[in-house]
Amino acid sequence: MFPPSGSTGLIPPSHFQARPLSTLPRMAPTWLSDIPLVQPPGHQDVSERRLDTQRPQVTMWERDVSSDRQEPGRRGRSWGLEGSQALSQQAEVIVRQLQELRRLEEEVRLLRETSLQQKMRLEAQAMELEALARAEKAGRAEAEGLRAALAGAEVVRKNLEEGSQRELEEVQRLHQEQLSSLTQAHEEALSSLTSKAEGLEKSLSSLETRRAGEAKELAEAQREAELLRKQLSKTQEDLEAQVTLVENLRKYVGEQVPSEVHSQTWELERQKLLETMQHLQEDRDSLHATAELLQVRVQSLTHILALQEEELTRKVQPSDSLEPEFTRKCQSLLNRWREKVFALMVQLKAQELEHSDSVKQLKGQVASLQEKVTSQSQEQAILQRSLQDKAAEVEVERMGAKGLQLELSRAQEARRRWQQQTASAEEQLRLVVNAVSSSQIWLETTMAKVEGAAAQLPSLNNRLSYAVRKVHTIRGLIARKLALAQLRQESCPLPPPVTDVSLELQQLREERNRLDAELQLSARLIQQEVGRAREQGEAERQQLSKVAQQLEQELQQTQESLASLGLQLEVARQGQQESTEEAASLRQELTQQQELYGQALQEKVAEVETRLREQLSDTERRLNEARREHAKAVVSLRQIQRRAAQEKERSQELRRLQEEARKEEGQRLARRLQELERDKNLMLATLQQEGLLSRYKQQRLLTVLPSLLDKKKSVVSSPRPPECSASAPVAAAVPTRESIKGSLSVLLDDLQDLSEAISKEEAVCQGDNLDRCSSSNPQMSS
């Protein structure tokens, strides 16, 4: 691209000629033609650099030309000397220029290839944009289909909610009825139980009053028992005094009687006395008890008799207290009264026993009633729980309907979410792989460090053993030196001065101590270093083992997560594949249905067009006949020309109105078809559930169509109005127009009925299979 640095510039051809310079303008060098006039924008900087490098060559060439013009004679004289050198330089310059041209051609070829590649890339991008546009259109169509399906599902959900609401209302009504009946029965049972409880409370209050009286009697009996205890204690004291007296007497008698006889008699007497004392105590206790009971009964009887006698004396006032008969009567009356009181007391005791039995029975009844109440409360709780369960079931069904709605709303986002999950799973997989590789590298480095530390341990042990051996050798040398010194001292006849020997010995000892200290210090330091190294190595080994275990656990967890992610990825791919297959099947069904609907619509439109054309030709024929009759009437009856013109205008206005009505009806039919198409998309889901009614709708459609066709034929084949005589042509023209108007209105009604029948047939065809739909189409066309 750049000219060679060795050349100072191109030599013009006139330099090698011996003839004088011509007057023609000198040509520019050939390399100037190599510079392109229009360069591509990508290589503009290269061309600018090339021009910058070639400018000095141009200036040098101009300088040479000017020098040639000024000194032609001198250049001619130097021809012989510089000829061969100039030729060689020119050949080199030509070779370099050829190389430069080849390089430039190669660059041009590369630029063309790059431009072609850019064009191909742009075309590929354009194709990708078109594909994206098509995919976007397909996605919009699919979204519309899904919206239609969602609308159908919404209708189904509303139906389900209405059904569940009705069932819930029915269950609530039944529950309310059961609850009302149970509450009524419970209230009745409670009222009966309250009445019984009131009676029992009354009986209990009476029993409590009696118990209070009995408690008072018991207190009196306790007081009497206290008095009896006091008397018993007094009698015991007297008995003890008598016993002491008897013992004293025995002692006195025992002194008089021998010991053996005394002991035997004393034992026998003591046993007898003990037995008699026990019997007496038992008799005394029984007598005390009977006496207490009799005393209580006597006191009660005396008290009752005193009260009753007071009553009698109060009620009966004797007229003469000295009469004996009255006293006898009173005495006999008192005796009878006492007998009756005794009988009443016996009866009262029997009533008390019966009352205690009745109280026990009532307590048993109360316990049974309480058990019944608890059982009824348990049944009520069970019924409430069952009601709560039913309400929970209804709520669960409602939540299930909501869940279905949410699933329908989430179905649109499933594919995108699966794609995102797959992308995130792949990215996580890459991150996990990188983490595992980095952790493995770090583990390898740490293991290498541990191995290096373990490899250093033998060298440290060797150094330690070497130091120990060195210490032993130094000690041996010192001992040898000391022994030699002692031998010298012994062998020498004249010992040296004591001061020198003592100094030398002291120095040797100091040196020995210093060497021992140094050796001990070095050995201790070496041992410390070895222990530290061992502890550090052990700690590093433990840490590395922990790290290795953690890394193994993390590796296992990552493997498990990778396995789970792989499973999730596989499930997501399967779901995506299923969704794509389902979308493809739905698209295929949609295209088939669209084709079927298009064919059926085209057939119906063609049929309607043929019928309309036939009816239009019929109307035109009738209009032509009416015009001919009108012309005949105009020719024959000049006097009614004005009326004929008016009738003509009326007929034209009627035709215009008919055309406008037909246009409006066509527009209305088109709008109706669009509305039916929109309603058809919305009612696909509901019509699929009505598959059982398809046969009835088809039969109904087949029965309606022949009646419509017969009606049309009867309208079309209606008898033409007879030609009137020349005396009444207007009366003949008016019925024809009325018949035309009636036929058009009938035609419009038939068209409306036919459009409704077409929409019903399309709904039926959507619910049935393709064979039934294809078999019903010829019947519709017939």
UniProtKB/Swiss-Prot annotation:
Keyword RNA-binding: no
Record's subcellular location: Cytoplasm; Nucleus
Protein name: Coiled-coil alpha-helical rod protein 1
A GO cellular component annotation in the UniProt record: nucleus
Record function comment: May be a regulator of keratinocyte proliferation or differentiation.
Coiled-coil intervals, chain numbering: 111-303, 344-437, 498-691
InterPro entries named among the record's database cross-references: HCR (IPR009800)
